[in-house]
């Protein structure tokens, strides 16, 4: 077997070749290629004339000697037009009911059925067996069919509670396409002279029958790690608890997991990674409402849980809370304490300065910086006599902010523990302390916990960096996940600097 990274590079080059000349269809081509390489089915929803059939035709060129069949369904379509006409000779000579399948669906590797919901019951029932079992009953015999990819298309969804739901459930990947939006792409499409029937894929990139068969075995060997399963189960529980969530059958979940295994395999990995789960957004929706719902739920999962983002923020919150507790304990020890000397008949208590505050001017440190008079303040200088007068009689108290300029009025009080507390305009307060008494260093316990958390964050970010090279995931998702991880990292760094 080819080296995993060489295989991933080859599939990437194959996809690029298939995408050539198709504008704003890269994601659709890549997911259809993934479906073809893993033997799954795709439903394309969108208005007429947006290259749905061309996407299917292109996928034929991914394989060596692949045969294609396409058909536009109508209400009057018959099984003979899809599965082949009856053999008059066999019926006449031998009385056998047998179809001539050459050139029809039973002998095609790539199948495109347009306006699929207009098919009648006879076609739908046979098609269900073909998709489920890859078998076709031709008269008295069961014939194995080589179909690797079924692409069904329509400009509408099947009606709810109709006989079409069984077939719709078999279409694992569902893509909602629209017209070309970008101006430059629209112009390029208009002036393109590329022949749609040309094969854009070099022979060296095309997949042989032997490779395809071997890859089916290799895909099944890709492991599903426990942490990834837990994410999938979390998503399943979230959907089960939402009132408007689509019903997802166990069969659909199982087929979706195989698609995730294929994504991992063709990305050069031996195990499903959280990044692969983004593919579920194209597998689990039913209509426009559930499509938006799946996008929202997967974004919550990817940006909050897949790389432990929310768990790390919860841990950080606990560390910060513990730090505040330790700071409060330290604050009680280092805060500047005055002496209460209120008499028995005094209307209000009055205080005196402690013996260590004997200088004519006192500089007291804020245990936490505050913004006072539009200035970030870390210490205040008081005239000792003015401070003594305020402690005895109350009234206005002034101090020089950071020891400079004129003395400014302060909102200051003595709390129940006999500590001086200064408050800003929003009434947030901090205690004052003598220089040398305040402990500025971070407690060793907190420092160690933050370092451990930062190391865990680096490991998660490294995991994401190693896994993000996935051809089948749109770059927009990678940007959102990276932003969520960077936000967690920034909050950790801010906590370390406080």
From Swiss-Prot:
ATPase activity is stimulated by ViaA. It catalyses: ATP + H2O = ADP + phosphate + H(+). It holds the Pfam family LARA_dom. GO terms for cellular component: cytoplasm. The keyword Transport does not apply. Keywords: ATP-binding, Chaperone, Cytoplasm, Hydrolase, Nucleotide-binding. It is found in: Cytoplasm. One of its GO terms (molecular function) is ATP binding. Its EC number is 3.6.1.-. SUPFAM superfamilies: P-loop containing nucleoside triphosphate hydrolases (SSF52540). ADP binds at residues 23, 49-54, 196. It is an enzyme of class 3 (hydrolase). Its main location: cytoplasm. Belongs to the RavA family. NCBIfam families: PRK13531.1. Component of the RavA-ViaA chaperone complex, which may act on the membrane to optimize the function of some of the respiratory chains. RavA functions as an ATPase. Homohexamer. Interacts with ViaA. This is Regulatory ATPase RavA. It comes from Salmonella gallinarum (strain 287/91 / NCTC 13346).
């Amino acid at each position: 077997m080819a080296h995993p990274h060489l295989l991933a590079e080859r599939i990437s080059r194959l996809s690029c070749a298939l995408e050539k000349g198709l504008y704003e269809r890269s994601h659709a081509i890549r997911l259809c290629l993934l479906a073809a390489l893993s033997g799954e089915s795709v439903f394309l929803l969108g208005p007429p004339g947006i290259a749905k059939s061309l996407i299917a035709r292109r996928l034929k060129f991914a394989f060596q000697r692949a045969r294609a069949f396409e058909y536009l369904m109508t209400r009057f379509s018959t099984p003979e037009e899809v599965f082949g006409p009856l053999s008059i000779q066999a019926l006449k000579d031998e009385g056998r009911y047998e179809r001539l399948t050459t050139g029809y669906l039973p002998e095609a590797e790539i199948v495109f059925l347009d306006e699929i919901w207009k098919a009648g019951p006879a076609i739908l029932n046979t098609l269900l067996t073909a998709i489920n079992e890859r078998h076709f009953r031709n008269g008295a015999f069961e014939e194995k069919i080589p179909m690797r990819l079924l692409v069904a298309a329509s400009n509408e969804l099947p009606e709810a509670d109709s006989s079409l739901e069984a077939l719709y459930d078999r279409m694992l990947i569902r893509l909602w396409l629209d017209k070309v939006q970008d101006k430059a792409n629209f112009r390029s499409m208009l002036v393109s002279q590329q022949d749609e029937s040309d094969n854009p894929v070099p022979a060296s990139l095309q997949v042989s029958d032997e490779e395809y068969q071997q890859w089916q075995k290799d895909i099944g060997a890709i492991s599903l790690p426990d942490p990834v399963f837990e994410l999938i189960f979390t998503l399943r529980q979230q959907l089960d608890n939402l009132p408007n969530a689509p019903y997802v059958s166990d069969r659909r979940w199982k087929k979706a997991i195989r698609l995730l295994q294929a994504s991992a395999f063709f990305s050069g990995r031996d195990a499903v990674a959280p990044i692969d789960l983004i593919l579920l957004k194209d597998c689990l929706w039913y209509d426009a409402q559930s499509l938006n719902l799946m996008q929202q739920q997967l974004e919550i999962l990817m940006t909050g849980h897949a790389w432990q983002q929310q768990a790390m923020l919860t841990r950080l919150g606990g560390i910060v809370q513990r730090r505040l507790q330790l700071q409060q304990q330290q604050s009680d020890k280092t805060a500047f304490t005055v002496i209460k000397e209120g008499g028995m008949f005094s209307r209000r208590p009055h205080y005196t300065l402690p013996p260590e505050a004997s200088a004519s001017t006192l500089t007291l440190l804020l245990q936490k910086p505050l913004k006072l008079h539009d200035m970030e303040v870390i210490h205040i200088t008081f005239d000792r006599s003015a401070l003594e007068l305020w402690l005895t009689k109350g009234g206005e108290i002034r101090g020089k902010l950071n020891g400079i300029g004129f003395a400014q009025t302060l909102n200051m009080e003595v709390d129940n523990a006999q500590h001086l507390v200064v408050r800003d305009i929003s009434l947030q307060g901090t205690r004052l302390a003598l220089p040398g008494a305040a402990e500025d260093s971070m407690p060793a316990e907190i420092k160690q916990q933050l370092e451990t958390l930062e190391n865990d964050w680096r490991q998660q970010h490294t995991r994401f960096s190693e896994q993000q090279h996935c051809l089948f995931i749109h770059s927009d998702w990678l940007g959102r996940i990276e932003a969520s991880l960077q936000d967690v990292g920034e909050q950790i760094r801010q906590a370390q600097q406080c």
